[in-house]
Regions:
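Intrinsic disorder/low-complexity segments, especially N-terminal tails and targeting/processing regions
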Residues: 12, 31-34
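Bacterial N-terminal signal peptides
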Residues: 22-32
């Protein structure tokens, strides 16, 4: 299996006045088939999108690309899982194509999560959070990182982390369950935690979260929404993955006792009932591996997409008929899910996949003379 990565961009294909700012959707995809010269020559014509949209390669040769964060200056930072690397991707002339991919760090322990604040890059390993200060001035010679917190469990099963700063200025750090389904001894297992930017005052924000690898805040209410991956080995069609809504601290979302809205776990469900927990805001496809998610806050896409939720579905690994390998859209009305639909698909062809979406973000800095 080839673990190359290609950040790809989706944009509306229309004529745009010269020098008009546009906001595009940037998508991290891990390649599963060999060859393709690190992303060149990929069969992008197999990707189906709504009318008026197009997809293109933003950067090639980003092995094992996973989570992404964009600095205010436009540098794209990308974490990895198995590769152990962290990259900086630079587009100096803002022509929608990367000019250079720089390896900032190597040999890290599943550095999946990346976040950016006040000129510093934050990186999440399995058991610790690192900070690289003034990073954009030292892309070719990054400083030794500051270790902010190294108290997290060392389990690699669901140990890789997605991190982001919330509107409250705190860094949100999930801790996945160290198993398919179990009751963890450490209360931080199957939770979302948060801390101050200096690594202090770590606290649990939400419980009963099996393995979230993507979250975002509603741009209007500033409330947290997150994806969660359902347990395995209950069958092809159960349980669903979830999109959850956490308007406040202290909520429990069911794992390991309850899955989806009302599926009692055959092993742990006798201990607690589904009625005790917060149900998902909407159930997603079973085993689609819903990872990154973002509210679309741009203005380039038609108005119907503004403040709606895009989800990167990585794709199933043990389902009889593969599912996922796509980007889906959850349409909201009055901040409540109304519809769950496919936005982009084609990375899965029959029973074989050549790409697996991981994360997405809105790129606000690109300027161009014309699209179309």
């Amino acid at each position: 299996m080839n673990a190359l990565g290609t950040p790809q961009m989706v944009r509306q294909h229309r004529r745009t006045p010269p020098a008009r700012a546009s906001l595009l959707l940037l998508l991290a995809v891990t390649l599963v088939c060999g060859g393709a010269n690190g992303g060149q020559g990929l069969p992008l014509d197999q990707i189906t999108l709504p009318p008026g949209f197009e997809i293109a390669i933003y950067a090639s040769n980003v092995p094992n690309a996973r989570s992404m964060v964009l600095s205010p200056n436009g540098t794209l930072f990308v974490g990895t899982r198995t590769a152990g690397d962290v990259y900086a991707i630079v587009d100096r002339d803002h022509d929608h194509k990367a000019d250079e991919v720089i390896t900032l760090a190597s040999g890290l322990n599943m550095p999946n999560g990346v976040a950016f604040r006040d000129g510093a890059l934050y990186v999440a390993e399995v058991n610790r959070i690192l900070r690289y200060d003034n990073i954009e001035a030292h892309l070719k010679d990054p400083p030794e990182p500051v270790v902010l917190n190294e108290s997290f469990p060392r389990d690699r099963h669901h140990g890789w982390k997605f991190i982001r700063f919330g509107p409250d200025g705190l860094l949100y750090v999930p801790v996945g369950a160290p198993c398919n389904v179990c009751e963890g001894e450490d209360e931080r297992y199957a939770s979302i935690t948060r801390m101050k930017p200096d690594g202090t005052r770590l606290e649990i924000f939400a419980r009963g979260v099996r393995n979230t690898v993507g979250f975002d805040w509603d741009p209007k209410t500033h409330e947290l929404w997150f994806t969660d991956n359902g347990r395995d080995r209950l069958g092809d069609d159960v349980p669903p993955d979830e999109l959850n809504h956490a308007p406040k601290q202290g909520l429990h979302f069911g794992f390991p006792y309850c899955h989806g809205k009302k599926i009692s776990d055959p092993e742990f469900g006798k201990k607690r009932k589904c009625e005790e927990f917060i149900p998902p805001a909407i159930e997603l496809g079973p085993h689609v591996a819903a990872l990154g998610m973002r509210f679309y806050t741009g203005k380039m896409f038609p108005g119907e997409y503004r403040n709606q939720i895009f989800i990167a579905e990585h794709g199933s690994w043990n389902r009889s008929a593969p599912i996922g390998y796509r980007v889906t859209l959850v349409r909201l009305e009055h901040h409540r899910p109304l519809k769950y639909e496919v936005f982009a698909e084609g990375w899965l062809q029959g029973s074989r996949a050549w790409g697996r979406p991981v994360d997405l973000l809105v790129h606000a800095r690109w300027r161009h003379a014309r699209v179309g």
